[in-house]
């Protein structure tokens, strides 16, 4: 018996130590640069802590003051490449910096031939290196790049930097077009980033969408692969995605892509001037969604040359997406002519609705009612969002949790109309400066169980809001968080996509990112 007790005690001690060791491994913090190298998807608390706090995309860095190895004061102007410049913050004592320099050094001639110059900026840390040590390290490894020194760390601190290596991709004028904290892991990753720098963020994503989601008839499939489940799913097409692609095409002036997307909508989704909310093969949904039709209407108006289509679709929306008292409603049924008895707040795209006002007598009264309904949906300044929908029959607002993609669309429409509440903007700014935005909250502003994750789409919409209100810092924060989900790998079929794998790709993320990128190009940020 005593022997058995000793065996049991020994086993208990063994498993206790094993559990303690596992706990230590789980809780052990990873080195900064090692965490920086992980990509593309991360938890909210990890996703941006290493991104420079004060950087603004489009910001000119050329005038910042540095020191040459000879002790002379300089700015970046003498070091800019003909077309593009990679400014990499590094330190000779930093192992991850050394790996990145070793990746770039053999590519020096290739980069130079492409008009790309590499400049090393030494984060001089007297406790870890000296000027002589830095010179010796570069000489010993025969590093062919120019280098300068942020000797008092003034620029490092001004930009709110956190780690090295951090690489700034500058255009020919010295403006930041892309920032990548952490190690560039491969030539394929660098190639994708250089393509981004040369052609803009949209190019790689549009290429991915064309290759993997855009079918032969111009429909944007929900996913890359067929699902085999109930419709809609897999390679079915949502009116939502068609409208977003048309929005992107209108913003970029791409008439051929616009025509292709619209032709699909007219052929496979159109039901008497309204769009079925999805198409699955030769079948389509039996109801429309007001927001989908408004998005297409707005894109037709923005593209120009579709006057008759704008008028006919505006009249159809006014006729079918209002009840007998003139209230705007979510959907109209093609099968039995019935209508929804509610209005979802994110369906109130005021810019699109204003297109209808002068075309349909009395439509202004419907807008006034909808504005009153939306104002009543406001949850308060502590959590400055809006209830999901209003039920006309019960005269009550939904008290369910908020899908933040839909909640953000409501704020976007408010911002586009010039009615975004200061409390809403302040909430966005605080969250984006902090741990980010989760996928789902209750009406009190608490994250709901299962909703503690982020999505590229939500951050894309935050970026669109930032564009509307002219907040460059918020825009940069939104883009950088969105791009933490983006694949940068020129040799990967996933390059340019916002997903971890082809199985995880959804059209909503890709299309919203394209719309955001299009707006950034038009603002020349």
Go through the PLM ranges and name each one.
Residues 9, 39-77:
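N-terminal "domain-start" segment that seeds a small globular fold
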Residues 76-98:
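Short active-site neighborhood of thiol/selenol oxidoreductases, capturing the structured segment around
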Residues 98-140, 153-157:
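Structural microenvironment flanking redox-active thiols in thiol-disulfide oxidoreductases
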Residues 135-173:
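Short, internal strand/loop/helix patches
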Residues 173-203:
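Thiol-/selenol-based redox modules, centered on thioredoxin-like
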Residues 202-208, 232-240, 285-291, 307-459, ...:
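Extended ligand-binding clefts on enzyme/binding-domain cores
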Residues 205-291, 428, 458, 465-468:
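N-terminal carbohydrate-binding/catalytic regions of secreted carbohydrate-active enzymes
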Residues 361, 407, 413-420, 468, ...:
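Terminal, non-catalytic domain-edge segments
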